[in-house]
């Protein structure tokens, strides 16, 4: 799976998706499913620390995944343009260097996001356990914590706060989405050109030999890798572009967007991020036979996988009588 640049970048994207989904899993279990737990406080200082790191980590990993998608589309575009075996764009070493540069750059750009918010105690409010809870004393009280905009972010007319929002909207969302649009169009054009070329190859005269027919059929296979990448890039565009627009609106109309828009659709934006992270795995399995093969080798026991391989080989031999006849004639 890792013998090409595209597969290496897909591996890096999968690492980001795993981290994003794992962080969201803990967040949903504690802050959503167990929010009404009467015997355990939800907004403690420790859990607010986790929530702060969850926000920073999810933004960092999700942005890294988006820029890796741009790198993947660019690498595939250059590979198709060069059209040479063992080109520089196809080497895993180049892909891993590119992934490391993206990881490091996004991490540096996400540093302001760590400085924007701070944990503060809610004055005048405290958490008290329910009367049915026997693990606490009768007059047990714990403080409630929440997020506040940090003092460093509010100085100089909220310069750091606005800079962070503009950076999220432009560098983390809009610019990679625009690049994905142009690269996706370029890949679609390449797919159409390859499809025209494939039709020319598969238009074999009726009096042609079996060897030439099989050769034309082999050369005329569609470029499934490029098609899979285009579908993945479209998913990124559908899920990320609306978030970029809302981030820019939030930078322009900060108070109004937070009060009247983001408060109501914040969960929808989080859902789009989760859909983007989860749908990639489905697309890999549906559109890549090599990915499916590797997935079954890892998940299924070896003796079960060997039986599946034998049945697959038998079905392939039964469905290709023409190939057998050609071999006997040779």
Show which residues each predicted segment covers:
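Non-transmembrane, juxtamembrane loop and terminal tail segments
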Residues: 199-214, 299-330
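Loop architecture of class A 7-transmembrane GPCRs
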Residues: 34-55, 60, 87-88, 108-174
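Intracellular effector-coupling site of seven-transmembrane GPCRs
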Residues: 8-16, 98-100, 132-157, 185-243
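Extracellular TM2-ECL1-early TM3 structural module of rhodopsin-like
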Residues: 5-72, 86-87
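Helix-to-loop junction signature of class
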Residues: 19-39, 58, 62-66, 106-125, ...
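Seventh transmembrane helix
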Residues: 177-183, 227, 232-248, 264-318
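Class A (rhodopsin-like) GPCR signature focused on the TM5-ICL3 interface and adjacent 7TM helical core
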Residues: 68-82, 112-122, 168-205, 227-250, ...
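Class A GPCR helix-loop hinge within the 7TM core
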Residues: 60-100, 286-288
